[in-house]
């Protein structure tokens, strides 16, 4: 057989390798090595000192063989979130969120909607309050039929990432967070968009400290449409706001659910809060109401423009997709329209989309809550500054729409709106602000379960 080149090289080199080995064998006994010079190559003695001496005799610690501590993930259950996300924490988080949005600091990509069977929809949000803030995502769904099965209509999970490393630091149940952040944002809107002057009310006073209402009938008259978790949350936020609440009326399609809510309210309401009166129709609930919170998942309007008094604030939180419109376009046409986020509302708020398609609303007249808050904050120390609230007896809140009557023209020729509409879709920035606040509150209180990643 032919011999390969590699084999020939090996055979040729063998005599030279043998001669070199013989020389090394002769020299080694004459030059014994310093054991310290090879200590780094030798395994440590079992049970002995594993530290290595350097050439100067100094002892240096060995390089740690342990891996860095594995990061942990804080898990917050619904009960954990309820404990940490108090009314004060919720309100502060939402006020800060909209201020950041109004200043242009927040990072808010478009949300994702994934339709399902019937009216079911899955959603995904992501946002951060600023570039150096934690990134937060929320993935969940809305299943209106869950109510009949005794389950919440909304389920979600929220994840918070470390702003420096991107490592997930917290994951929390998102149902309570979504409910409370939505209602807290409505409370922020109520404080910014409604005043006693707008409704011609002279019997409404600023609430003291804990002040939640006036049970003698004076104070803000609130109407709640719907009987789900948002209805209850909005009632709680209303009585915890800056103005006293004198009356709460409730109207809902589901009478049994409404009865349960009223019974629960009478036993758990904050001290000093007024009774919740259950009425038969939405029209009855809206009669003389200063603030109307529409908290349904209806795809069609649930109230009429003629039921809403001049100067009222209508809060709509159920039209979170283009196919849902709980407020009629003729009422939108008469309103100053304020939304949580302009781009989101123009694409996905059913009330806004329907009014745009009907030609009774122009995109340029739509304001955002963040813009209002930033503008008002800038003018807070200027008593003569325009606060975008019409304060005479014949009008209401500020910069308008094109559906109001010409007879309502303001000093600069604008058409004054008859009412104000806060139309909320819900945005990821609200979740980001809420989740970070919940995580911080939970860590301070020692709430939650650490999990290894």
Over which residues does each language-model region extend?
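Low-acidity, Ser/Thr- and Arg-rich intrinsically disordered low-complexity segments
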Residues: 4-5, 12, 16, 20-22, ...
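Intrinsically disordered, low-complexity terminal tails and inter-domain linkers enriched
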Residues: 35-38, 47-57, 61-65, 198-220, ...
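N-terminal ligand-binding/catalytic initiation module
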Residues: 41-46, 51, 56-178, 185-187, ...
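Glycine-rich adenosine-cofactor-binding loop
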Residues: 186, 199-205, 214-239, 252-253, ...
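Adenosine-phosphate binding glycine-rich loop
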Residues: 197, 323-392, 406-453
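NAD(P)-binding Rossmann-fold cofactor-contacting core
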Residues: 243-268
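Rossmann-like adenosine-cofactor binding region
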Residues: 271-360
């Amino acid at each position: 057989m032919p011999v390969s080149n590699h084999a020939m090289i090996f055979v040729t080199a063998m005599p030279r390798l043998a001669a070199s080995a013989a020389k090394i064998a002769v020299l080694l006994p004459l030059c014994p090595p310093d054991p310290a010079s090879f200590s780094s190559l030798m395994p440590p003695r079992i049970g002995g000192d594993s530290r290595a001496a350097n050439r100067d005799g100094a002892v240096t610690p060995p390089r740690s063989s342990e891996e860095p501590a594995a990061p942990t993930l804080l898990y917050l259950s619904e009960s954990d979130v309820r404990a940490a996300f108090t009314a004060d924490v919720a309100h502060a988080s939402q006020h800060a969120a909209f201020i950041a949005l109004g200043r242009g600091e927040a990072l808010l990509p478009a949300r994702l909607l994934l339709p399902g069977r019937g009216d079911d929809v899955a959603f995904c949000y992501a946002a951060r309050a600023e570039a150096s803030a934690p990134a937060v995502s929320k993935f969940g769904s809305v299943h209106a039929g869950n109510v009949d099965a005794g389950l919440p209509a909304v389920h979600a999970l929220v994840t918070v990432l470390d702003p420096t490393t991107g490592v997930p630091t917290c994951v929390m149940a998102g149902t309570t967070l979504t409910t409370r952040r939505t209602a807290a944002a409505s409370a922020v809107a109520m404080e910014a968009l409604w005043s006693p002057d707008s409704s011609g009310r002279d019997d409404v006073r600023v609430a003291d400290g804990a002040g939640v209402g006036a049970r003698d009938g004076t104070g803000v008259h609130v109407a709640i449409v719907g009987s789900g978790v948002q209805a209850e949350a909005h009632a709680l936020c209303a009585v915890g706001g800056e103005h006293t609440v004198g009356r709460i009326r409730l109207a809902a399609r589901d009478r049994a659910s409404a009865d349960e809510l009223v019974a629960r309210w009478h036993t758990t309401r904050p001290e000093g809060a007024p009774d919740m009166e259950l009425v038969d129709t939405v029209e009855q609930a809206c009669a003389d109401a200063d603030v109307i919170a529409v908290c349904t998942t209806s795809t069609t309007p649930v109230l009429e423009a003629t039921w809403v008094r001049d100067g009222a604030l209508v809060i709509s939180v159920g039209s979170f997709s283009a196919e849902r419109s709980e407020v009629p376009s003729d009422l939108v046409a008469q309103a100053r329209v304020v939304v949580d986020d302009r781009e989101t509302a123009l694409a996905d708020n059913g009330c806004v989309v329907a009014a745009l398609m009907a030609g009774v609303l122009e995109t340029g007249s739509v304001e955002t809550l963040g813009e209002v808050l930033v503008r008002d904050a800038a003018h807070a120390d200027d008593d003569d500054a325009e606060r975008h609230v019409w304060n005479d007896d014949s009008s209401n809140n500020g910069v308008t729409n094109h559906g109001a009557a010409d007879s309502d023209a303001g000093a600069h020729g604008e058409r004054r709106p008859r009412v104000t509409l806060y139309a909320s879709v819900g945005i990821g920035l609200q979740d980001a602000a809420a989740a970070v606040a919940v995580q911080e509150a939970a860590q301070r209180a020692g709430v939650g379960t650490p999990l290894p990643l």
